[in-house]
Amino acid sequence: MATETQPRDRTVPDSPVSDVTYDLMQALTSKLEAIEAHEMYREDAHGDVRQLFDDMLDDDRRHAERLLDALRMELR
C-alpha cells in the first residue's frame, strides 16, 4: 500500500510564531545550553580531551550564530 507523504502543518491556529520560528528558537536554546555545558567540561579536561571540547565549542558557536541569523531572517 503506497501512500504519498504530505507536508505536516503543525501550526497551532492561535500561535504567535510559525513552526519554523519556534524550531529555530528551540534549536538555538539547545545549542546555547550545549555551549554552557561544554565550557564546564572543558575546564575539567586536559590534553587531547581539552582540544576536543575546544573544537566542539568552536563548532557550537558557529552553529549558534547561523541559527541566530536564520531566526533574524525569519522574523523580518
Task: Identify what each model region corresponds to.
Residues M1-R76:
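Iron-associated oxidoreductase/ferritin-like identity signal
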